[in-house]
């Protein structure tokens, strides 16, 4: 664990620019195995995203890399990634869904869904890795497509304005509901 060793001697800031490589392989029991406590998770998807801003603070580009086993239908996978990124952009930049005691206090038309004319250049990167036998080698590419988006955007704005934010939608951006 090279990262663990380096963290003993350096701060995170001191490790900026260094790269660390690793692999995670989940051991599971075969479907239908006669095991007392079977590990039944078939597969995990992994993802990372990058947000680049223009000088005025608008999003210039989103790059999204998703590891998904075998892309059975690559065009459909790209569409799923793009849709999830745009959904995540709405969460991060424009959508507000107030609740009061668990009950919605907004109507659909007032949520502030992200508008198509504001969508920046999107780069979908499909990372295929063989090895899983189930489902022709495919791993799910559903909700994971929207999960890294808001943190990537928040990180870009932190570099842009120095303001660390932990609530969505982010404040101090050029985007309005």
Indicate residue ranges for each PLM-predicted region.
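C-terminal catalytic domains of large/alpha subunits in multi-subunit enzymes
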Residues: 1-177
């Amino acid at each position: 664990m090279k990262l663990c060793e380096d963290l003993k001697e350096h701060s995170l800031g001191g490790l900026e620019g260094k790269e660390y490589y690793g692999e995670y392989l989940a051991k599971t029991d075969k479907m239908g195995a006669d095991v007392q406590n079977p590990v039944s998770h078939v597969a995990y998807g992994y993802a990372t995203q990058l947000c680049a801003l223009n000088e005025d603070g608008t999003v210039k580009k989103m790059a999204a890399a998703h590891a998904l086993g075998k892309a059975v239908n690559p065009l459909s996978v790209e569409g799923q990634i793009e849709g999830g990124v745009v959904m995540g952009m709405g969460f991060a930049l424009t959508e507000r869904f107030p609740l009061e005691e668990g009950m919605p206090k907004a109507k659909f038309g007032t949520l502030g869904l992200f508008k198509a004319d504001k969508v920046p250049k999107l780069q979908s990167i499909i990372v295929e890795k063989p090895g899983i036998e189930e489902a022709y080698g495919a791993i799910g590419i559903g909700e994971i497509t929207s999960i890294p988006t808001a943190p990537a955007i928040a990180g870009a704005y932190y570099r842009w304005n120095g303001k660390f934010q932990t609530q969505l939608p982010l404040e101090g951006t050029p985007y309005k509901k």
